[in-house]
Structures are given as structure tokens and as C-alpha cells.
Swiss-Prot record:
Any one cellular-component term (Gene Ontology): extracellular region
Organism listed in the record: Staphylococcus aureus (strain MRSA252)
Gene3D superfamilies according to UniProt: 2.60.40.1280, 2.60.40.1290, Immunoglobulins
Keyword Signal: yes
Annotated stretches, region: Disordered: 54-249, 675-697, 896-1112
Start-end of Basic and acidic residues biased regions: 61-75, 92-106, 130-145, 216-241
Gene that produces this protein: bbp
Name under which the protein is recorded: Bone sialoprotein-binding protein
Modified residues (Pentaglycyl murein peptidoglycan amidated threonine): 1103
Compartment(s): Secreted, Cell wall
Motif LPXTG sorting signal, residue numbers: 1100-1104
Domain of life according to the entry: Bacteria
């Protein structure tokens, strides 16, 4: 089915059809593989939808329960043909026997009627009774009694299975899916693809009555015309004669969703300015909708397609009109009286003309819009569908169909054929959908019961929503109806002299006898089922059924209803014949385009794209070859411009508007998954493939031989194996297992990811459905593993690494492997020690430092571990991968970093932060050392300024035993190494007034052990008069090297007679700075803040300036004073003695 009432916006020059749906009825056949394709898909009436049901079904438990007597089936010789593949180009032969005729023999039993009704597996034993003709009362014969309490029919076992079968319907139902047709979307392809259609009808000719004809069953098989003659004679045949009719083989059309517009038909108001004379018809044709065989299968819904291409003269103005006429024997809608024609539109959907339809004259009048005022050289196209008007053609006949656009006519001769009844023994029935009311959602079905006027015993007709196969089997089809107590069912008897129209459509029921009240009608026979009990009959009857249907989605019609006739044959077995009708839809289309400039005579090129299954480059050499739709075909003009179309459902493409003498290039895009077939595989230019690109020159005619073929590109696989390479040799060993859940990524040659998978429990992986080409395979390293070495041996046994390239060239590639081994773990660390000798080396006597915090960072600077040294100063970090790390030592409080990198790496200190790289081994060389600051070294800075002018009278008794060894070098730069052992016990009472300013700088490194007790009382800047009596026993050994810068002014008056009045004025400038490093720490007082370039503190003179001369004077003065004191003490000692 093509576009339905769609308006597409495409390029100006293109052609597109504007579609509109209509309805038709179709006799349905199930089990065939026929497909209806063409420019439009006609909906219709379907029958025999489950024709091959018995070929595919099996006995079920329900069938066994429903059968107690032997069931002898007669299967026709065409049973195997029902599932045979249908060739679209070969029609089915006429008068073939159908497998749908099933004969169920009923064995006599002793059961009563009540038993039959209560037990589905029991049948009564009775002999056939004689039935009078024209007896329409319901039969009470036990043999033919139908149990109306059961909903569905029992499925009959095929192939002469011996089963006892009653006439009681069972609960088993055949599920059959009919084959659906393809739907064409190419609006320019007016040639429908033919499909097998049913032929050979068997009905009574109302216009040619004849005498009764006696004919045997064999004669009917061999001479189908005998059956037609039998129907037309309307005679009573011998009861032993069993007419056989060919089961229809028409296709089951695809259900179509379509937009449907209906309106009450009104005569077209033809505008006064008809411009038919300004319309130039360039092409028009009449084609058959199903099969181009000259036969219209009217009951199969076969439609007539009228296409017309025409040009609109530039003189046409808005408001002008043109006409399109249908043949009087056709009608736009088969089962409705309402029809609105499609609009003529351009490719963009803009309306060129709007139409109205006159049902009385069967003429469309199109009125042009202002489109014709705005564009020149407007081209238009119409595609109209119609059906045989059964009112005008009640019986089979030959017709000359004539259609016309703007009074330009075209004709085609066709033969109209109608359906024949389905016959099984005395059961013979046929039906059609005769009317559709989309407003009330009602459908009318007209059923011919016993149209052959056979002597039918115990006749029952069942009407069912859904499908009924020719053999009477029920199935779920393409649609449904609602059958309940509100369903209208009328029964009419056909008099012996009356003829039934072969069209199966009754326009005036009043001409037949209404016997509705003379038969038993059960409208609740089952779910959506009704039953009519006719009893014994030998006349034809018409049943009119008006049932409701439930509409589907927008414009979606799926209406299907079947009927089944059941009779008792001469063997007291039930015989069934079934018929099914279905409603589908079809569309009309109209389209056009406009061009700016007039064009010269133009030509077209194109033809066909097909799937070349056998790859030989020749069309039609393999039955599986088929057309390829939607293949992009590009036309390149001489000036380099291009335009493209896609192939339709029939593989057809076409470019029009081409100029004579010009050269064009046609290129075919290779569909995804296909490859171009062999070029020029034969000398027949109509059958070969021209390749992906072909150049053609227009030589005064169309060229419709530019074909190309493609075949499906073969698909391949790629992959193999991921394993644990325990021995790390890069070779797959037999005892090495696969690794599960390894992620593998596949990329194409452009780097695009086209697939991802994981290895299975065996380590296997694969990628499927791949084309030839180059691919990249990437393996993700599993957690805890390391890639093994790659490319060590044969391609199928080595490791290809983490990333590898796989090439597919007309074969699978199973060589892409990757191996991994479990990643080892490493440790790092060592030692933090107390470097007592500060040499930056670990000595055997030096001990570790406990509780030093050590931090480990990874290459990104992230902390991955922290620990503390143990009591031996040891630390370590474990479970480390190879990589770069940083170790950070936190300096202990009160300690100083020792020197780094002074000796071997495992014995020196590496400092507070150490970068380390682990490569497949532990690293225990990361050490660090610290030492303690020597705060016991005496650092004495003394600044004393003493200015004394005193008169001191001192009486001192001093007993001193002192052993002093002093080596002192005092200058601005002094280095003193003193080792003294002094034991002093002195009692000194000194009252002195001293003004002293001394600057002493001493830098000494000494190791001393001293015990000193000093009591000093100093009053600076004092004037003291002391009278001192001193008795001293002193032994002093002093080695003093003193360089003193002192300024001493001494005025001393000494009386050697133990009475000494000394007036001493001493000015001393002394700066003493002592820096001592000793094992014993003694606190010292700070020196003055002023120091020289040797870092010696200096005292400033009171004047604020430095005076070396004054210092020297002080030195000498001090010496003299000392000598004087010695003399004085010595004299007094003598006196005392």
C-alpha cells in the first residue's frame, strides 16, 4: 500500500501521489504464500484463509475427547499443494481439487440423543432418513442434530485418521496466520506485480437457464465446464453425484492503515469554464490490481488502476475545471456509496486542484487553485483505483473498460470472473461482504446457502467472527466482528425458477421469499457466533447478516467474518464447507509539479535493482532473487548537478525529463550489508548488472535497461582467548587457565567502538556479524594482573598484548589472544637512627629512633599509607605494585636532620622526603638519621662595665687551694682549649667598688668537668674604701696568655703595713664571649648584642666609640696594680709573721 492521503514536501520537479483510501471485499485464502504487490494494494473480500490448516495442524487432546467413532476423511489430491510455494508469475490451474473438502463419516452407535448432547465423544446410531425436497423446518433427526451449547468446532484429523466424529462442535480452534502482501510506494510504477488468483466459479447463470444435467464426480473433476453448466441449469442432480469446485487460491491482502474520507455523493457543480481542451495527456493506462492476465477477479477484491499523466497549459487560470471519467462498469468504492476524490498536489503538498465526484455520472470534476497562476508548465499525475460495479455487472462477462482524462480516453479489454461456492459433498456455500457503514460501524454479509440446490440433509450454517477455512476449520484471522443478540440475520429462499447473481450481491431482497421465521436461529451459539438450523433442504437460500465491528486505530479497518455449512452425507458423516470475507483498503493518488521553462521532448532512463542471491550478475537465474527497495540511485546531469531517487518496492527506479543526445551518469549506492554483484554477466543487456556506476547517452528513446544487482555481504567472526600466563612466557600452555570477565572492546578502522564483550568462564570471547576489514581489539587488564610478553610464538598461541589489529578477509579470525599473570606485590622501608656522631652514616653503636612517623604517597601525591618506626627504628610498607612512590619522614621533636647521601645507599641518610621507584623488587634502603643539639656547650656572653673609684679596706682571710691550668687566648679572635680540674674552697668577702668595662670574646671547644661554687656580690659604679686584711694561702699555677684590650686607670696608695688604704680607680673594658661545646651543659648568660665579623661580642666604651689605646693602657695598669698587690700582700705577710 502506498501513501494514504499524504502530502509530501519534496523537490519541485518530482512526482508524488496524494492518496485516498477506498474499501473492497476479498475472499480470503489461508495457507498460500501469494503476495499482492503493485502501485496500490487493494483491499477486498477474503475466503479460504486457513486453506492449508490441516497440513500444519495435529490432533489435540480436545479432538480426542470429542471423537469416539471412526472418522474417515477423504483428502483431495491437492493437499500437498496447499503449502507449496506460490510463484507470482504462474497462475494456479483451474478446477484443481482442494484439500479443504473434508468428509467426516459418522459411525452408527446406540447412544440416545440426550447422550449425544451431554457427551462430546458419543454419537447416536441412526440411519439416514428420507428428506422431502423444500423441507425447511429444522430437522430432528438424531444423526444430524447440532449441539448448540458448544462454542467452537472440533478440528478434524487429516490423513484418514480413524476417529469417531460427531457433528457437535468442539473447543479446539485452528490458529492460522495468512500471508500478507508487500506494499508498493513508488507512485510512478503503474505495473502491479501479478499474483496467483482464484479462477473457476460455480454459480447459476441467471440469464441462461438450461435443462438439468446429470454428471459424475469424475466428470466434474476432469471437466470444470460441466460444473458451470450444472449451476446454470438449476437442476436437481443425482444424489450420488458430488460436484467439486476448485478452492480459491487468492491471496490474503495485507491489512492497511489508511486515512479515509467519506462524503455523501453529490453531482459535481461543473464550472462554466471547462478547460479540458487545455489539458494535454502525456500518458495514461489501465492496469489490473493483482495480476496482469486480462481477468478481473472481482470477488478477490482485484481493482482496476487508472493512471494518467498530463500537462496543464499556462492559459489555465484559478477556478477553471477539468474532468476525469470512470468506466460505467466500475465504481470507486466497492462496498460504500460515498467517495471523495484525492486532491492533485505538487511534491511539496501544495494543492493544484480539488475534486468532487458525481456518482451518477461516475465523473470527477477538478477545480484548479491559484497554483496554476503562480507556476508555469504544471505537470500532474493521477492514479485512481476502482472496482467492478456489481450492480452493473451481476454476472461474469467480458468488458471493454474506458477511462478518460480531459475527454482523452484509454481502454482495456478484461474478463470479469466471480467466485464459486466451496463444495464438500452436499455442503456448498459462498459469501461476500456486500456493504460497509463506517458511521454505524456495521458490515453486511450476503451468504449463498446451497446455491447448487443439492439435497442437503441436516443443514446447519454457522456464522463466526474471524476466519473459517474451506474445510470448515475455524481460525483467528486478520479481523473480527461482533455477533450477538443484536445481530440482524435474515433468511430468504430462492424459488426454483429464480437465478442467483454470480456477483453474490443482492440489491433487492424483496424478490425472494423471507423464511427467517421458518428456520431456527441461535445468535448465541458461541462467543461471536450464530447458527441457523435449516434441516433438510434442496433449494438455495440467501442469508443476510448485518453485524457490528469495532474500529481500530485511525482509519484502521480489520473486519473479518466466516461462515460454515454442515450437512450429513450418505454415510451419515458430517461434511463441512467454509467461506471467509475480509475488508481491507486501497488508495488513490494524485500529484504534479511545475516548471519555469518549456521543455523539449524528454526521455527517461531507469529500471531495476535486485538481490542477486547466486552472485552471477544475471536476473532471474535463482528463484530466491527478489527486487530491492529503497536503494538510492543518483543521476548526474551533464553540468554536474545531481538528483536522487530510491527504488520502489518492486526494485524499480526511473528518471524522467532527460534530453536527447545528452550523456548522463547513474550511480547506485551499495545498501548496507550488501556488495555489488558481477558486472555484465550476460550479453543480454536487459538481464545483466551494469555495476555501481553506468554512463548512458540518450539516443531519441527511453533506456530502461540500467539495472544493477547486489548480494548480501557475508559476515564473519573475530576473537579467541584470554588466559593466565602463570609462567610468564607469553605462550598458551595446556595447564594455564582462561581468565573470566575480561573486558574486550572492538573498534572499526576509524576507531569507532562497534562492540564490547567480556570473556566467558573459559576465557573465550567473540564478535560476530563482521564484514571484511581491519579492526582493533583492546583488552582491559584485569584487576590484580599484569600483561604478559607478546608475540613470542605462533599467532594462535601467543599473546597479542593489550591492543592488537585483527584483519578479516573472507574468513573468521580466531587468533587474537591476550595473556596476563598475577601481579606480584612488593615492600619498601628500612630504618631511622640516632646519628650521635653526626656523620650521616649508620654506625654499629648508634641506635634506632622509635615512633618516628613515616608517610607513603603514590605518584599522584595521594597518601596511601602511614606508619611509625618500631622500638628498633624499623618501618616498612607492604603489598605495593611496581611504580613511583614518595617516602616522607616526620622529624622528631628536639632532633636535627643529619647529613644525607654520605655513603652507600643502605647505610646513609636519605633525608626527610625521598622519591623511590619500585621495579619488580623490594626496596629496603630508605633510611634517615637525626642527632641531638649540644645545648650544654657553654655560651657565655658577659658584658660588665665597672667603673670603680674606691677606697677599700679589706680584711680577708682566704684559704685557697686551687689547681688551675688555664690556657686562654683572648682577643678579638680567640681559640681556647682548656682542660681544667679545679677544686676551690674559698671564702671571700670582698667589698669593692669597681667600674669595669670589658670586652672579651672567647671561642673555645672544651671538654671540662668542673665543680664551681661562686658567691659574688657586685655593685657596679661604686666608690669603695676598704680595709682588707687578708690571709691567704694560695697555691696558684697559672699559665695565662691573655691579650686584653683594657683601659685601666689606677691610683693606688698602699701601706705595706697591713694597713692598706687603697684608692683605686679602675676602668676596665672587657668583652668576653665564650662558646663551649662540652659533654656537660651549663647555662650561661647572654653576651652583649654587639659582635664583630668573627661573631665576637664587643662592648662599646662609655663614649660610644671603640678605643684600643685605652684598652692597652688598662691592661698595663692592671698588671702594675697586680704586681703592687702582690708586693703589698707579701709585705703584710711578713709583718704578720
Amino acid at each position: 500500500m502506498i501513501n494514504r492521503d499524504n502530502k509530501k514536501a519534496i523537490t519541485k520537479k518530482g512526482m508524488i501521489s496524494n492518496r485516498l483510501n477506498k474499501f473492497s471485499i476479498r475472499k480470503y485464502t489461508v495457507g498460500t504464500a501469494s503476495i499482492l504487490v503493485g502501485t496500490t494494494l487493494i483491499f477486498g473480500l477474503g475466503n479460504q484463509e486457513a486453506k492449508a490448516a490441516e497440513n500444519t495442524s495435529t490432533e489435540n487432546a480436545k479432538q480426542d475427547e470429542a471423537s469416539a467413532s471412526d472418522n474417515k476423511e477423504v483428502v483431495s489430491e491437492t493437499e500437498n499443494n496447499s503449502t507449496q510455494k506460490n510463484d507470482l508469475t504462474n497462475p494456479i490451474k483451474k478446477e484443481t481439487n482442494t484439500d479443504s473438502h473434508q468428509e467426516a463419516k459418522e459411525a452408527p452407535t446406540t447412544s440416545s440423543t440426550q447422550q449425544q448432547q451431554n457427551n462430546a465423544t458419543t454419537s447416536t446410531e441412526t440411519k439416514p432418513q428420507n428428506i422431502e425436497k423444500e423441507n425447511v423446518k429444522p430437522s430432528t433427526d438424531k444423526t444430524a442434530t447440532e449441539d448448540t451449547s458448544v462454542i467452537l468446532e472440533e478440528k478434524k484429523a487429516p490423513n484418514n485418521t480413524n476417529n469417531d466424529v460427531t457433528t457437535k462442535p468442539s473447543t479446539s480452534e485452528i490458529q492460522t496466520t495468512p500471508t500478507t502482501p508487500q506494499e508498493s510506494t513508488n507512485i510512478e510504477n503503474s505495473q502491479p506485480q501479478p499474483t496467483p488468483s482464484k479462477v473457476d466459479n460455480q454459480v447459476t447463470d441467471a440469464t441462461n437457464p438450461k435443462e438439468p444435467v446429470n454428471v459424475s464426480k469424475e466428470e466434474l473433476k476432469n471437466n470444470p465446464e460441466k460444473l458451470k453448466e450444472l449451476v446454470r441449469n438449476d437442476s436437481n442432480t443425482d444424489r450420488s453425484t458430488k460436484p467439486v469446485a476448485t478452492a480459491p487460491t487468492s491471496v490474503a491482502p495485507k491489512r492497511v492503515n489508511a486515512k479515509i474520507r467519506f462524503a455523501v455523493a453529490q453531482p459535481a457543480a461543473v464550472a462554466s469554464n471547462n478547460v479540458n481542451d487545455l489539458i494535454t495527456v502525456t500518458k495514461q493506462m489501465i492496469t489490473e490490481g493483482i495480476k496482469d492476465d486480462g481477468v478481473i477477479q472481482a470477488h478477490d477484491g482485484e481493482h482496476i488502476i487508472y493512471t494518467s499523466d498530463f500537462k496543464i497549459d499556462n492559459a489555465v487560470k484559478a477556478g477553471d475545471t477539468m474532468t476525469v471519467k470512470y468506466d460505467k462498469h466500475t465504481i470507486p468504492s466497492d462496498i460504500t456509496d460515498d467517495f471523495t476524490p484525492v486532491d492533485i498536489t505538487d511534491p511539496s503538498g501544495e494543492v493544484i486542484a480539488k475534486g468532487t465526484f458525481d456518482l451518477n455520472t461516475k465523473t470527477i470534476t477538478y477545480k484548479f487553485t491559484d497554483y496554476v497562476d503562480r507556476y508555469e508548465n504544471v505537470n500532474a499525475k493521477l492514479e485512481l483505483n476502482s472496482y467492478i460495479d456489481k450492480k452493473e455487472v451481476p454476472n461474469e462477462t467480458n468488458l471493454n473498460l474506458t477511462f478518460a482524462t480531459a475527454d482523452k480516453e484509454t481502454s482495456k479489454n478484461v474478463k470479469v470472473e466471480y467466485q464459486k461456492p466451496i463444495v464438500k459433498d452436499e455442503s456448498n456455500i459462498q459469501s461476500i461482504f456486500s456493504h460497509l457503514d463506517t458511521t454505524k460501524h456495521e458490515v453486511e454479509q450476503t451468504i449463498y446457502v446451497n446455491p447448487l440446490k443439492l439435497n442437503a440433509k441436516n443443514t446447519n450454517v454457522t456464522i463466526k467472527s474471524g476466519g473459517v477455512a474451506d474445510n470448515g476449520d475455524y481460525y483467528t484471522g486478520d479481523g473480527s466482528t461482533i455477533i450477538d443478540s443484536n445481530t440482524e440475520i435474515k433468511v430468504y429462499k430462492v424459488a426454483s425458477g429464480q437465478q442467483l447473481p454470480q456477483s453474490n450481491k443482492i440489491y433487492d431482497y424483496s424478490q425472494y421469499e423471507d423464511v427467517t421465521n421458518s428456520v431456527t436461529i441461535n445468535k448465541n451459539y458461541g462467543t461471536n457466533m450464530a447458527n441457523i438450523n435449516f434441516g433438510d433442504i434442496d433449494s438455495a437460500y440467501i442469508v443476510k447478516v448485518v453485524s457490528k465491528y469495532t474500529p481500530g486505530a485511525e482509519d484502521d479497518l480489520a473486519v473479518q467474518q466466516g461462515v460454515r455449512m454442515t450437512t450429513t452425507n450418505k454415510y451419515n458423516y458430517s461434511s463441512y464447507a467454509g467461506y471467509t470475507n475480509t475488508i481491507l483498503s486501497t488508495t488513490d493518488s494524485g500529484g504534479g509539479d511545475g516548471t519555469v521553462k518549456p521543455e523539449e521532448k524528454l526521455y527517461k532512463i531507469g529500471d531495476y535493482v535486485w538481490e542477486d542471491v547466486d552472485k552471477d550478475g544475471v536476473q532471474g537465474t535463482d528463484s530466491k532473487e527478489k527486487p530491492m527497495a529503497n536503494v538510492l540511485v543518483t543521476l548526474t546531469y551533464p553540468d554536474g548537478t545531481t538528483k536522487s531517487v530510491r527504488t520502489d518496492a518492486n526494485g524499480h527506479y526511473e528518471f524522467g525529463g532527460l534530453k536527447d543526445g545528452e550523456t548522463y551518469t547513474v550511480k547506485f549506492e551499495t545498501p548496507a550489508g550488501y556488495l555489488p554483484t558481477k558486472e555484465n554477466g550476460t550479453t543480454d543487456g536487459e538481464k545483466d548488472s551494469n555495476g555501481s556506476s553506468v554512463t548512458v547517452k540518450i539516443n531519441g528513446k527511453d533506456d530502461m535497461s540500467l539495472d544493477t544487482g547486489f548480494y548480501k555481504e557475508p559476515k564473519y567472526n573475530l576473537g579467541d582467548y584470554v588466559w593466565e600466563d602463570t609462567n610468564k612466557d607469553g605462550i598458551q600452555d595446556a595447564n594455564e587457565p582462561g581468565i573470566k570477565d575480561v573486558k574486550v572492546t572492538l573498534k572499526d578502522s576509524t576507531g569507532k567502538v562497534i562492540g564490547t564483550t567480556t570473556t566467558d568462564a573459559s576465557g573465550k570471547y567473540k564478535f560476530t556479524d563482521l564484514d571484511n576489514g581491519n579492526y582493533t581489539v583492546e583488552f582491559e587488564t584485569p584487576a590484580g594482573y599484569t600483561p604478559t610478553v607478546k608475540n613470542t610464538t605462533a599467532e594462535d598461541k601467543d599473546s597479542n598484548g593489550l591492543t592488537t589489529t585483527g584483519v578479516i578477509k573472507d574468513a573468521d579470525n580466531w587468533t587474537l589472544d591476550s595473556g596476563f599473570y598475577k601481579t606480584p606485590k612488593y615492600s619498601l622501608g628500612d630504618y631511622v637512627w640516632y646519628d650521635s656522631n653526626k656523620d650521616g652514616k649508620q654506625d654499629s653503636t648508634e641506635k634506632g629512633i622509635k615512633d618516628v612517623t613515616v608517610t607513603l604517597q603514590n605518584e599522584k601525591g595521594e597518601v596511601i599509607g602511614t606508619t611509625k618506626t618500631d622500638e628498633n627504628g624499623k618501618y616498612h610498607f607492604d603489598n605495593l605494585d611496581s611504580g613511583k612512590y614518595k617516602v616522607i619522614f616526620e622529624k622528631p621533636a628536639g632532633l636535627t636532620q643529619t647529613g644525607t647521601n654520605t655513603t652507600e645507599d643502605d647505610k646513609d641518610a636519605d633525608g626527610g622526603e625521598v622519591d623511590v621507584t619500585i621495579t619488580d623488587h623490594d626496596d629496603f634502603t630508605l633510611d634517615n638519621g637525626y642527632f641531638e643539639e649540644d645545648t650544654s656547650d657553654s655560651d657565655s656572653d658577659s658584658d660588665s662595665d665597672s667603673d670603680s673609684d674606691s677606697d677599700s679596706d679589706s680584711d680577708s682571710d682566704s684559704d685557697s687551694d686551687s689547681d688551675s691550668d688555664s690556657d686562654s687566648d683572648s682577643d678579638s679572635d680567640s681559640d681556647s682549649d682548656s682542660d681544667s680540674d679545679s677544686d676551690s674552697d674559698s671564702d671571700s668577702d670582698s667589698d669593692s667598688d669597681s667600674d669595669s668595662d670589658s670586652d672579651s670574646d672567647s671561642d673555645s671547644d672544651s671538654d671540662s668537668d668542673s665543680d664551681s661554687d661562686s658567691d659574688s656580690d657586685s655593685d657596679s659604679d661604686s666608690d669603695s674604701d676598704s680595709d682588707s686584711d687578708s690571709d691567704s694561702d694560695s697555691d696558684s699555677d697559672s699559665d695565662s696568655d691573655s691579650d686584653s684590650d683594657s683601659d685601666s686607670d689606677s691610683d693606688s696608695d698602699s701601706d705595706s703595713d697591713s694597713d692598706s688604704d687603697s684608692d683605686s680607680d679602675s676602668d676596665s673594658d672587657s668583652d668576653s664571649d665564650s662558646d663551649s661545646d662540652a659533654g656537660k651543659h651549663t647555662p650561661v648568660k647572654p653576651m652583649s648584642a654587639t659582635k664583630d665579623h668573627h661573631n665576637k661580642a664587643k662592648a662599646l666604651p662609655e663614649t660610644g666609640s671603640e678605643n684600643n689605646g685605652s684598652n692597652n693602657a688598662t691592661l698595663f695598669g692592671g698588671l702594675f696594680a697586680a704586681l703592687g698587690s702582690l708586693l703589698l700582700f707579701g709585705r703584710r705577710k711578713k709583718q704578720n709573721k
